[in-house]
């Protein structure tokens, strides 16, 4: 439950900061799902596949995809207060 509350707080903080700092500063966030990094090195391929299967898109996210999402938020001058979920559909569940 603590993780869910902290994630909700981060999303709300993004919106509050965007409102408070506009129009001079835009505030957005990226909320990635299962990003395969060295942190997952201890997991077996079977464990990773089980995790991937729990997402609607049944895949993990590459670090480069998170970077691409961040670049999109930076480039889009009309976007502020948004949290871009890059989670292979996890929030759909």
Regions found by a protein language model. Give the residues of each.
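C-terminal substrate-recognition "lid" of short-chain dehydrogenase/reductases
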Residues: 62-86, 91
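Catalytic tyrosine of NAD(P)H-dependent dehydrogenase/reductases that use a Tyr as the general acid/base
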Residues: 3, 11
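Structural signature of beta-strand start/N-cap positions in the alpha/beta core
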Residues: 26-28
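Short, flexible catalytic-loop segment of classical short-chain dehydrogenase/reductase
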Residues: 31-42
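Active-site helix of classical SDR
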Residues: 6, 14
């Amino acid at each position: 439950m603590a993780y869910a509350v902290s994630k909700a707080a981060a999303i709300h903080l993004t919106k509050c900061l965007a409102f408070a700092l506009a129009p001079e500063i835009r505030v957005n966030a990226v909320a990635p799902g299962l990003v395969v990094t060295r942190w997952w090195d201890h997991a077996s391929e079977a464990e990773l596949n089980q995790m991937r299967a729990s997402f609607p898109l049944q895949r993990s996210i590459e670090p480069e995809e998170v970077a691409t999402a961040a670049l999109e938020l930076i480039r889009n001058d009309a976007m502020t207060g948004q949290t871009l979920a890059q989670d292979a559909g996890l929030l759909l569940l």
